[in-house]
């Protein structure tokens, strides 16, 4: 069988006809807060409100629905630790197909349970491998041995066409109010979303500049398209933005992105965390890290988008509540508002009071203090966390800490030590 490797806008239109009665048409919302913040018109495409709280359902449903009757009868497989697995599970139940979903053993129980919920009795989950790559190998072996069909999360034309239906919806919704977009921002992981969107927008809204956004710790598309001019596999990726942390983009998505994506932005993971918290507190939007990427990118484009009309794809909202402490910590670290030190503390009455009076500013707050008194020693080791009210107070804080203990260790600059705290 010949595998199709090219995509055009007609493929997206056909995909839309297949999925429109199953996939939710998510809102395209004007965002007053972001519009005022950046002095432009910002719209959000709310894929976090999709049935599975992510755009991945679009591609999964389209890719599975075009399979032959024989392939559907034999069943489908996928490997995923997140949103793609939920999209495949939802589709398997909707089409009454057998699906075997492989997930790493390290997958949070919440995500495993969500896949079970969406797939119900149609889905079998196999937890295997410590990493996604190990899990993928097992899935491919199982697929071949059982003559099933593997549903690729991004490097498949039918998957990409399904993701592209999001762009068709944006244009349909905006045309009602005669809105045209100058910029569209969307996250890049493996490249399926940006490829589908850019293909469709190039045909029907060529004036719209397509901006791909990646986490700075996993910018595989930027490295491939812009830096190396060939597909590369990153040696190491930061997996915090798990929905967009891919070491190697797809062959198909690489070719499409190279043709149609106008620019690439890399966003620090700490900035993503600040955006997640901002979206929740200011707009009551629960975005996962990958879902917040597009909005995070606006800060780097703030001069270019002034007076323009912009749309950001909020690609997903599957955020594990157990991660919120880490998200807050990463945000405070990025904003330079929270700082950790290891100090030698005098073991005598009144030492802590002296520290508070001599080191802390009037608005500084101690958020962590770990200390075990040892009567046989003159000093004891203390781990202390200090949160600032004003980021400009940092230099004075460091001076005061140094005066108190010249041998202090500033933990924020030591990734290994800092990782023990969160």
From Swiss-Prot:
A single GO molecular function term of this UniProt record: L-serine ammonia-lyase activity
Pfam family, one: Thr_dehydrat_C
Residues covered by the ACT-like domain: 339-413
Domain of life: Bacteria
Gene Ontology biological-process annotations: isoleucine biosynthetic process; L-serine catabolic process; threonine catabolic process; threonine metabolic process
Amino acids binding pyridoxal 5'-phosphate: 83, 189-193, 315
EC identifiers of the protein: 4.3.1.19
Pathway field: Amino-acid biosynthesis; L-isoleucine biosynthesis; 2-oxobutanoate from L-threonine: step 1/1
Residues passing through the membrane, by range: none
Positions where N6-(pyridoxal phosphate)lysine occurs in the chain: 56
Enzyme class of the recorded protein, top EC level: lyase
Family the entry assigns: Belongs to the serine/threonine dehydratase family.
NCBIfam families: PRK08639.1, THD1
Protein name: L-threonine dehydratase biosynthetic IlvA
Organism: Staphylococcus haemolyticus (strain JCSC1435)
Classification lineage: Bacteria, Bacillati, Bacillota, Bacilli, Bacillales
